[in-house]
Design a protein with these regions (language model features):
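Acidic, surface-exposed loops and disordered segments
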Residues: 1-223
Length: 223
């Protein structure tokens, strides 16, 4: 079954050329609800390893919470006050094949009986042998965090397609951000942890052209 392209190759490249990490937003310009819903759907509908979806998206619009996050989040210090939306992406802790979390995955995918047991055996083989991620709680959490970056990238691409700017944020004190948000009742720190953050809005000025390696340096064809 063929799918009719929505964008040409040239339009897609132009979209990526325009997308850039935005450090300053127009505080007077807010993202329409319908557009931001589409961005959230891009995250929700993203692919993840073995269909795990080990994420939650916190949309932090509370100004008091943003003010608390600002001094411990140097990567968004120039953005957090003026960004239309701030999203904190959480990753699931202890997302093991033998956990209740994976029970939900199996049920959601409609597996029962022998099919459910076969699915769990497949997930076990992947986590124990193929990916080898069960050495520690941290290694399982890091695996879950990897999945959140897929969702983050899709959300930024969706935003760019809608003419909305964004910036991925890793520059923050993870322990403090977790403490602030969990302490405010935003999530259960036994079950979830902060993976990465994103700001969204509309840039206030032109951003200098991208500095990227030429494609010949980053792509090798093995024929």
């Amino acid at each position: 079954m063929s799918i009719k392209p929505i964008l040409t190759a040239e339009q897609l490249t132009a979209l990526w050329q325009r997308r850039a990490a935005t450090r300053a937003y127009d505080p007077a310009k807010k993202i329409p609800d319908s557009d931001f819903e589409a961005i959230l759907q891009a995250g929700r509908l993203s692919p993840s390893s073995v269909g795990s979806e080990p994420w939650q998206f916190l949309v932090v619009q509370n100004r008091e919470l943003r003010a608390q996050l600002k001094p411990v989040s140097w990567g968004m210090a120039t953005q957090v006050d003026d960004a239309s939306h701030l999203v904190v992406i959480l990753a699931k802790k202890n997302a093991r094949y033998d956990s209740p979390f994976f029970d939900d995955i199996i049920a959601r995918r409609g597996f029962t009986g022998e099919a459910a047991e076969a699915a769990r055996a497949k997930y076990a083989r992947f986590q124990i042998h193929d990916a080898d991620i069960l050495a520690s709680e941290r290694s399982v959490f890091d695996w879950a965090c990897k999945q959140t970056y897929i969702a983050m990238a899709n959300m930024m691409t969706a935003a760019a397609a809608l003419g909305i700017d964004s910036c991925p944020i890793e520059g923050f004190d993870y322990a403090e951000v977790n403490r602030i948000l969990a302490g405010a009742g935003c999530f259960d720190a036994q079950e979830w942890g902060v993976s990465v953050m994103l700001t969204f809005g509309y840039r206030t000025a032109n951003i200098k052209p991208k500095s990227r390696k030429p494609i010949e340096e980053v792509v090798r064809w093995i024929r």
